[in-house]
Amino acid sequence: TSDNTFLYENAIDELNSMLNIYNDKYLLYPVLYFYGFGNGILFKALLQNKNHQHIVVFEKELEIIKIMLHLMDFSQELKENKLIILDVNSLEFQDYYDLCSSNPFFGFSRTYFLELSSDYYEKDKEEILNLNNNLIDKFKNAILSSGNDSKDVLQGIEQLIYNLPKMITHTAYQDLLKKRENLSDTAIIVSTGPSLTKQLPILKKYANKATIISADSSYPILAKHDIKPDYVVSLERILLTSEFFNNNFGDFDKDILFITTHLTHPQTIKNLEKNNRNFMLAYRGSEFIKYLKIKNFGELSEGHSVANVAYGLAVFLRHKNIIFIGQDLAYSDDGFSHTKDYRNLNKHEGHYERDFGHFRTIAYGGVGFVESSFYWSLFRFFLEKRIYITNQSGFCNTYNCTEGGARIEGTIEKPFKEMCETLLKNNLNKNFPKIVPLSSHKQNELLLKCYYKIIKSINHCKTFKKELLKSYNHIQESFSNLNLISNLDEGKEILNYLIQEIDKTKFKLEDEKMLDLYEILNPILTQFELNLARIYVLNPKTSEDSYNKSLLWVKEHIEFFKMIYTHIKAQEKALIKNITPLENELTQRNLEKYKRKINAKYNF
């Protein structure tokens, strides 16, 4: 190598040792990860095993790769992506995201480990630890983004059904985008990070020259300082968020459009209605909404923070410049989580001490580090993903003018005052076109359509529960009978039959007719398959090992089907419980006869 050290002490012995280990423990692993290319012979040998779909190699000394690729032909492996070589020095956010969120890498993320191809690479200890931590973090983020909490999903479905009449009888998100795109060059997104306070005087001075998009938590702060936003965006489904609207600012609210999600807490709507605020509900990332087919009311940008949604709105309205302020995504030097005007500051007491040292990230400006949190790190991940996509389009510049907190990759870091002076020369005509609700006739049509779909889904829950229970009882009974069988071959035959029966049931779960249940089932399906991968890669050495692996496989699926049944039952109850506002709306509109026809069709 360039530093006159050897890649191997004894190449043949080390190769044989590694092959013995991998052919023993990791024979069935679809994906293997290595740091260091070495002489490449190990990868050539491992890829003879058809179970290994991909070998991912991270290397920082590209000269080694050039030499070895010259000596050995890997053209076919590289062409088929069986061998993936990544330069450690140039890895970016998108590289990690593409790897960790796509299959089979994502599907086998819980079997991930990083191995050194030889002892030579131990000298890169710091880079290896950093790489390993990045991969683990990105796999975690990918899992979280796919959904991991069924209770959250159920709450979202409940509140969606409850809120449907309010959504349909208010303005549609797509109408907003059509009527107001290209009306403003610059949008300023206001969040409640610790750095916001110092930016408020500048924001007030330039508020009439740009579109102001406020997070719900920033709205009371802006009202206090008499800075009127054009849009206030709310994302959370919890009751606490509704308190941001439990106030009366009188004429200040005139011409502000409040945008909240389909799954917002009903109290948020009550607080908005109480003072006659102009609001709309828009959906985001909802499989049940896709089932209802009301496309005109979405789709808000994906992501786990209100800043993501606000940024998506700014992009969809075709702003050429988007500026973040108060988007710290980190604690201040004195340990504060938010600006000191933030109404829920006391809810975050002790969080700085809890998170200290665990989520440290690069500071704004690229010098030093700041303390972040798990959720801020997650928010930043999705925001950076969205910014990357926007940057690829080339029509918009994204500026981080927070002047504090964490660095957000993909943004241009500039002082807020400088960007206002550069971009905001003239007043903006804020007499934006009015967005009106759909006609009464169209509303009636959508209300009835949604009612029909919900009743149909309730019926689907009932019928599929029965079908699933029948399959479950059959599999459970056959599985229990294994205790009465002493012959291994006979037991294996029964297990193979049960695995086929399991596959038939799982195939039904993937049918497009299950669209109304995708949302409630997706979190447990994802988590189950990720955990199942750990069983899949077990390498049985004996007939007993093979039998026990199949036994474990069937046992896990029996428990899984019980969970599926419970979740479908929960959705059925949620739909029945929360359909009342929609029923009342239909009654008020003299649509009772259509409601009765739908109920009769499905015996509801």
What is each model feature region?
Residues H52, P229, H319-I322:
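Proline-aspartate-enriched helix->loop->beta-strand connector
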Residues F58-E61, A215-S217, I325-D328:
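A short glycine-rich beta-strand->turn/loop micro-motif centered on a GG-aromatic cluster
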Residues V190, Y206-K209, I213, L235, ...:
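Alpha-helix capping and helix-loop boundary segments enriched in small/acidic/polar residues
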Residues K209-Y219, K224-N271, Y283-G285, L292, ...:
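Catalytic or ion-translocation cores adjacent to nucleophile or general acid/base/metal-coordination motifs
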Residues P266-I325, L329:
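Active-site/ligand-binding-proximal alpha/beta "capping" segment
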Residues S301, A310-Y388, F395, C401-K417:
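Catalytic cores of enzyme domains
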